[in-house]
């Protein structure tokens, strides 16, 4: 019987092949669903779909094949063998609409009864929803959208029309498995288990749709009206009118122009267009995009309003993060972009892709400040995901810049006033093997004037497509739950009536702390890329040159030391094979090879060394402890462990501030000792036991001594700068 059903399913999949040409779904999670979601192939799987749909089931079947997941061949009554999978519909469809029934479907009730009688039966319930068309639409619907837009309550006839219209804009959501055994064991009244499961699954489906589609879109007239009616904006208009009572209408029109200048106008059609363009662009200029810790993105989005807090390396950051979020089945965030990007045609495209624009300086313009603040409050109240760059502008040096807290203060102020869906701050590390604008950064650092963004620059950017820029890296850092953070900083915030107060007195200090924590989390999520690692080694060596064998050995040792003593919980090392790293660095960067019999030499000329310092600065904080410890041995053969601890702790307050490191006293002692042990295990130091533990450097003629000097060279110029500063201060 089961073989007949299996053959029948395969026949239906084959029969539907022409129809599937219209269907090109993206899958969330996109890379390895079984691993990311924790689906155990050794246990039976029951895929649960919200409504009965043969097309949905065929789409699921095809993609289970693609990702090596168990295929839904059977109905639940045939389920039981390891590696087998079945399917279940929570709701059956009538001709025009679903058949409403508050009871659990009979197959689910039967499966629960089987599991209650058979204690060895363990089934994984995997909720699956297919979103036909990712357009969140506006609050009012056209006739076309009423018929062709995805509707979870669509009947069979409407579903066919939806598939025809939306097949190329489809999202297949696969949820985390729910343990049937755990649900049964946790329920005292077994008769209610099936009903409870049905409710749990419905919540999953509702959250899937919410994350995938986001809030309803707004139009310009709606946002203009809501912002201008806000009390804070009306007060700002009143203040301006007091100076010139006869021109209130002119001031109101000025406020309206500000709203139009600021407001995003997201359109799903433009988002899809940008996604297609960016997909082509990334393939042309990058070897790939590496994304880390994206597996908890959707979990966060289901429970919180996500505010992305990203470091800023390049103009590409705006597009890259939105692209990554969209590819993971979520709505791209509203992104705060500089007004310098609001030029034709880029400004219009970015605005319709979800960017809103802000001036670099508000310059005491209280009316503009009130309008911008109220627009941010509007987005927070509506539940839109946000993205902003706390540094305020692109880093010209490769290091994180001190945060500018204005945007974060507006977001936090809007949240404590409106008390909407809980907010999570999600810091994001963005890095590149080659930053497109790096040469213009160097020109500006040398005193050159920043060139304004223009259409001419855009046309000139075509030459970028002729080059390859290595890889791009996006790492999602440890999230900061705003409610928990506020509870720690100001426990009574929930009890205060802040709805009419423009800005609580305690908010400024809290925002500063939150910004500092966010920056620390960004650096904690560092991606140690091949280019950055090679640049760090080359720039720390004398004359910016290293024999290939020496470079390979240093990379091997450095990778082991920072891996074993990795004090960065969210950080990662992109590549760990030294030969692979050097080969990739030669291909992408400006490192030159000079061939010599027996041992080639790799070299950076002076101009290229300045460029490579940008990439070294991306990861220099990873070497804080090993490089600082190595510097104690440049002029001393032996140093006691206690002297090392005291010396490192004397410098750490300065380095922690400069590199955004947030380590407690206990962490510092643990990290220092861990680094000492790792340096000893890798031959850079020699441990001498006894009542007073001591460390000795290798003999000068040893290869390991050269590696120790290179390790020390990473921070040497920074430590010399501290020394010069202290010497000058001491002379007064």
Model features per residue range: what roles?
Residues 1-732:
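Membrane-interfacial terminal anchoring regions of lipid-handling membrane enzymes
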């Amino acid at each position: 019987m089961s073989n007949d059903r299996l053959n029948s399913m395969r026949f239906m999949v084959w029969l539907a092949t022409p129809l599937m040409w219209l269907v090109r779904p993206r899958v969330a999670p996109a890379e390895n669903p079984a691993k990311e979601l924790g689906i155990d192939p050794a246990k039976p799987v029951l895929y649960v779909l919200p409504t009965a749909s043969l097309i949905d089931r065929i789409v699921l079947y095809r993609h289970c094949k693609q990702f090596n997941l168990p295929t839904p061949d059977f109905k639940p009554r045939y389920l039981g063998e390891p590696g087998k999978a079945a399917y279940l519909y929570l709701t059956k469809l009538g001709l025009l609409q679903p058949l409403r029934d508050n009871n659990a479907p009979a197959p689910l009730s039967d499966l629960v009864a089987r599991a209650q009688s058979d204690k060895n039966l363990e089934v994984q319930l995997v909720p699956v929803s297919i979103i036909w068309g990712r357009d969140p639409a506006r609050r009012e619907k056209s006739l076309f959208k009423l018929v062709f837009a995805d509707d979870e309550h669509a009947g069979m006839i409407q579903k066919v029309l939806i598939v025809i219209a939306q097949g190329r804009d489809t999202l297949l959501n696969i949820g985390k498995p729910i343990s049937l055994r755990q649900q049964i064991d946790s329920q005292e009244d077994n008769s209610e288990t099936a009903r409870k499961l049905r409710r749990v699954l419905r919540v999953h489906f509702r959250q899937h749709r919410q994350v995938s589609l986001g809030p309803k879109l707004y139009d310009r007239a709606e946002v203009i009206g809501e912002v201008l009616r806000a009390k804070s904006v009306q007060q700002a208009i009143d203040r301006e009118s007091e100076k010139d009572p006869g021109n209130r209408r002119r001031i109101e029109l000025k406020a309206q122009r500000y709203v139009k200048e600021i407001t995003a106008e997201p359109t799903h059609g433009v988002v899809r267009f940008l996604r297609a363009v960016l997909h082509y662009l990334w393939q042309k200029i990058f070897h790939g995009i590496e994304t880390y810790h994206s597996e908890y993105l959707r979990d966060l989005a289901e429970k919180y309003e996500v505010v992305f807090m990203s470091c800023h390396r390049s103009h590409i950051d705006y597009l890259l993060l939105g692209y990554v979020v969209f590819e993971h089945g979520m709505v791209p965030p509203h992104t705060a972009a500089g007004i310098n990007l609001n030029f034709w045609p880029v400004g219009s495209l970015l605005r319709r892709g979800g960017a809103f624009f802000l001036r670099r300086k508000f310059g005491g313009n209280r009316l503009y400040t009130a309008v911008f603040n109220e627009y941010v409050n509007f987005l927070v109240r509506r539940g839109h995901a946000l993205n902003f760059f706390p540094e305020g502008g692109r880093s010209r040096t490769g290091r994180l810049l001190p945060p500018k807290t204005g945007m974060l203060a507006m977001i936090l102020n809007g949240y404590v006033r409106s008390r909407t869906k809980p907010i999570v701050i999600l810091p994001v590390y963005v890095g590149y093997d080659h930053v497109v604008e790096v040469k213009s950064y160097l020109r500006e650092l040398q005193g050159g004037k920043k060139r304004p963004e223009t259409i001419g620059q855009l046309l000139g950017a075509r030459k970028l497509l002729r080059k390859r820029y290595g890889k791009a890296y996006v790492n999602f850092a440890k999230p900061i739950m705003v409610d928990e953070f506020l509870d720690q900083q100001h426990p009574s915030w929930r009890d205060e009536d802040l709805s009419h107060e423009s800005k609580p007195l305690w908010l400024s200090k809290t925002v500063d702390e939150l910004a500092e924590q966010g920056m620390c989390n960004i650096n904690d999520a560092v991606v140690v890329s091949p280019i950055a690692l090679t640049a760090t080694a080359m720039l720390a060596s004398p004359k910016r040159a290293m024999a290939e064998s020496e470079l390979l050995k240093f990379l091997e040792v450095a990778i082991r030391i920072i891996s074993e003593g990795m004090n960065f919980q969210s950080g990662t090392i992109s590549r760990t094979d030294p030969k692979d790293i050097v080969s990739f660095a030669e291909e992408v960067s400006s490192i030159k090879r000079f061939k010599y019999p027996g041992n080639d030499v790799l070299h950076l000329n002076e101009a290229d060394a300045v460029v490579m310092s940008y990439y070294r600065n991306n990861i220099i904080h990873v070497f804080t402890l090993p490089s600082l410890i190595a510097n104690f041995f440049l002029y001393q053969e032996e140093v006691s462990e206690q002297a090392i601890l005291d010396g490192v702790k004397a410098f750490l307050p300065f380095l922690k501030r400069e590199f955004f490191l947030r380590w407690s006293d206990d962490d510092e002692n643990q990290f220092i000792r861990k680094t000492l042990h790792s340096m000893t295990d890798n031959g850079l130091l020699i441990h001498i036991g006894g009542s007073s533990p001591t460390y000795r450097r290798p003999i000068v003629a040893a290869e390991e001594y050269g590696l120790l000097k290179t390790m020390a060279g990473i921070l040497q110029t920074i430590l010399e700068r501290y020394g010069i500063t202290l010497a000058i201060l001491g002379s007064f």
